[in-house]
Structure formats: structure tokens, C-alpha cells
């Protein structure tokens, strides 16, 4: 873990419950946060002095749970034309990646009655997951 990255967590409820396979969803969240950390580390190879940050937001309302992970890493630079390609198996931007991580994340989210969206932002990336209750 990179101790120089600020991780900010915001939630609108102390108790958010979802009927799920907790092991599978834990892997989803771990994979997405790990990707954010790696993206920030990759950016820091070229830009030495920036405020490294990951923001995690978890919100619940009557019919859905929304998770948003935002980072200020390199973003989806290789997927500007078609952001959905980020979900294709064996597509990777990492030196040692397999390209399976996000396709597995997508399948797991879909299996849990959810939808994932990858949103390019000016300085980084945003991932939004909505689980229907």
C-alpha cells in the first residue's frame, strides 16, 4: 500500500446492507481500489509533486446503493474513444496485467443486480456502481 495516497470515505448511512456474496464483492472493491492506487503510482512516475487522492462514496436510498470511486491517477487514457473496451478480457495497460480484472469485476457486479460505469474525468478516473435493491 502507498502511504502517500489520501483515501477519503464518505457515506450517507451507518448501516448499508446488500444481499450478496461478500467474498465476491470484497474482491470487486479490492480490485477497483488497487487499480486506483496503481494508476496514481503510474502518474507519479512522470509527475512527482501532486496530491495523490482516492475518494470512495457510498450512498443508499430506498431502491439502490451507489458506490463511486474517484482517483487522480492517469485515468482511462488508452480508452478515450470507447471507454467500454476497458471491460474486454485480455485488454490491459499494465506491464504485468492479464486484462481480466475489470471483466471479472463487471461480471460480478452484474451477477449482483448491479451496473458499472467508467467515467473519464479531467485529472483521473471515476467508477460508479449502482446496485438495485
PLM region spans:
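Short alpha-helical Gxxx[C/S/T] motif in the catalytic ATP-binding
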Residues: 101, 105
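Conserved micro-motifs of the catalytic ATP-binding
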Residues: 17-20, 93
Amino acid at each position: 500500500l502507498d502511504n502517500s495516497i489520501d483515501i477519503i470515505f464518505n457515506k450517507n448511512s451507518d448501516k448499508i446492507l446488500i444481499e450478496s456474496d461478500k467474498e465476491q464483492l470484497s474482491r470487486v472493491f479490492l480490485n477497483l481500489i488497487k487499480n486506483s492506487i496503481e494508476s496514481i503510482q503510474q502518474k507519479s512516475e512522470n509527475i512527482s509533486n501532486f496530491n495523490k487522492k482516492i475518494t470512495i462514496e457510498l450512498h443508499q436510498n430506498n431502491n439502490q446503493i451507489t458506490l463511486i470511486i474517484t482517483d487522480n491517477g492517469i485515468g482511462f487514457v488508452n480508452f478515450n474513444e470507447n471507454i467500454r473496451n476497458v471491460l474486454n478480457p485480455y485488454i490491459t495497460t499494465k506491464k504485468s496485467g492479464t486484462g481480466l480484472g475489470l471483466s471479472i469485476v463487471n461480471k460480478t457486479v452484474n451477477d449482483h443486480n448491479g451496473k458499472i460505469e467508467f467515467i473519464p474525468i479531467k485529472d483521473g478516473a471515476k467508477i460508479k456502481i449502482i446496485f438495485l435493491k
